[in-house]
Amino acid sequence: MKKSKGLHELYNKDPITADKFVWGRESDPISRRGFLRKAGLASMSLALGSSIPFAKNFPAGMIPAAFSQSYDPFQLYGKDDLILLNDRPFNAETPAHLLDDNVTPASRLFVRNNGIPPVESQIDPKKWMIHITGESCMNKTTLSLEELKTKFKHHTMQLQLECGGNGRSEFTPPARGNQWSTGAIGCPEWTGVRIKDVLEYVGVKEDALYVAYEGGDRHLSGDSRKKPISRGVPIWKAIKDESLIVWEMNGMPLPLIHGAPVRMICSGWPASVSGKWLNKILIRNIVHDGEKMNGQSYRVPCEPVKPGSKVDDKDMCIIESMPVKSLITFPKSGVMHNKNSKLKIRGHAWAGDSRVKELFCSYDFGATWKKAKLDRPINTHAWQHWEHDVEFPQSGYYEIWARAVDDIGRSQPVVLPQWNPRGYLNNACHRIAVSVKI
């Protein structure tokens, strides 16, 4: 008996061959469009339950959005709507349509852990201490959380956090790590103090290069001598006005799972630099060499490589600013819509350390694009909201694609960006399926 294979398994192995096997589809190596013969078009239309008006524009090696996500339900207290990826360490993401809020609720912010969080019963905010040290720290100091709150000016900002591996599940061949879809992103409101104010208080030597953190989480092995993660940012990033040490999220005390009682926020970079359960700040005179700073972690090849290649550690570069990206949050993928009315779509866009300048939408697989209404960010490093009305020419199967362009002209790619071994920085256009009926 032949082994059966799922659609995703076939496409992960060889998307072009899968196209031909599943749909009888031939691909143009130059345009990257797929040509469906009559039988293949009928097969895909039957599977989708509708005709495909712009089938000729559909990119090669791409699974239709209607089939691109399938989830088994799994509930966790306070995170009922998240999709579980693994449970040790606990990591979970939010489906795109549940990220529709302008300000992300705590219950819908993705969770990414590298170790075991501290036990809530053992955390007393009144006794929590933050040690500030390192080769480039002039006056090594220990501050209580209460002192942090009383010695420095408070700031409240809406700042986005995105996992460096958001979108990893779309890479072919598959990349190692949690198979995030599109939901490892959020933009809550945070309250705390600026890192630069704390650094000025303790004094920083002229040779300072990096600011790093350590947290109260434990290594998965249980070995107290090992740190599950200790990352950092260059000093210039740490002293930006938007780089904070925070204790509130959306006006409430930080939830334990999001770093209570206090954490760092260095928005626009991989969320792994925004350390949770903060108990130590290190001012370094070298590029920080803590856990998850070296090797392949949160690094990409310094030069483009062939998909599936093995890359030496010495040829990997640290990820800094995240790329331009967008998300469709309304409607939910798979929506049924009446042709006689316009479909209102909306979502968010962001661009690491930059700002999104324009947002475009397409309903014909990228053949044409229409400019959407794009709001300005409420503050630097907050995501931007956009909306657009779509009018369909006829009934059938459609996909809405969203493409953001940042303020220096960098645009989201229609298909997957450059492959890398760990599946970081996927900023391909987000898309949803729409069935239009008369």
Task: Give the label of every model feature segment.
Residues 1-2, 41, 132, 139:
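Contiguous N-terminal and early-domain "leader" segments and peripheral loops that mark the onset or edge
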Residues 6-9, 47, 57, 81, ...:
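Acidic/proline-rich low-complexity IDRs
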Residues 29-30, 34-35, 109, 400:
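Short alpha-helical segments used as structural interaction elements across diverse proteins
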Residues 28, 40-42, 65:
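Intrinsic disorder/low-complexity segments
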Residues 34-60:
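N-terminal export signals
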Residues 61-438:
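Structured, non-membrane catalytic/scaffold regions adjacent to prosthetic-group chemistry
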Residues 15-20, 24, 40-43, 87-98:
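N-terminal accessory segment at the very beginning of proteins
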